[in-house]
Amino acid sequence: MEKELTNNHNPFKHVYTGVDKTVKRAIPLKAIKKIKNLDLSLHPSLDFARDMFLFSFYTRGMSFIDMAHLKKKDLQNGILSYRRRKTGQQLFIKWEKCMQEIADKHKTDYDSPYLLPILKYPYDNRSQYRNALYRTNKNLKEVAKLAGISIPLTLYVARHSWASIAKSKNIPISVISEGMGHDSEMTTQIYLASLDNSVVDGANIQILRV
């Protein structure tokens, strides 16, 4: 019995002991600016990945799957409207110059219904999306290295960063919740709590000084 326990270093390895928690990472505004200011003109694949990251950030953390399915007709009279595929919630975003610059830089074919060149064919959208997501996240790792960012950069970091920066600027939870398309403010509170450990870290420092 003792031998069995000794060999099994983690007896709870296959036991579910709680609710899964996704690790969420955010970067500060100064890191976003570093990414934006990179000269990637000689690296078109990295340039595209960087611009998709920025587009997500500019559009209040729009998820990549929603970006992929944006249609040209979704942009009318200076307002971009789309329905979140995750929740079905309809969102409206004021179209800004920074968004237009990315759309102009990465124009789709004239006869393409899509606003961004993520889905390029009218068939097998799921496979196209998965491949584009993989390539973009892979290239973002290289972008992060060039920008001197230590955390693994992914498209979701853009969403997490928008929420974190909004919170740091004392934007009300209700506004952040609406901006991100959450179904409740409670969801946003949980989301933000998982992003920011600075308050807890600060409390721990005070305790350790006692």
Predicted regions and their residues:
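Basic, Lys/Arg- and aromatic-enriched nucleic-acid-binding interface segment
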Residues: 4-64
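Conserved tyrosine-mediated DNA breakage-rejoining catalytic core shared by Y-recombinases
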Residues: 7, 13-14, 69-105
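Catalytic-site neighborhood detector that most strongly recognizes the C-terminal catalytic loop/helix
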Residues: 18, 84-88, 180-205
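Active-site/catalytic core of tyrosine-dependent DNA strand-transfer enzymes
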Residues: 26-33, 96-150
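Short, basic (Lys/Arg/His-rich) helix/loop patches that form interaction surfaces
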Residues: 37-44, 109, 137-178
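Short, contiguous acidic/charged loop-to-helix segments that flank catalytic cores in large enzymes
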Residues: 40-44, 81-94, 123-132, 151-157
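Short, polar N-cap/turn motifs at the start of nucleic acid-interacting alpha helices
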Residues: 73-81, 149-151, 171-190
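DNA/chromatin major-groove-contacting recognition/catalytic segments
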Residues: 92-97, 101, 105-106, 193-210
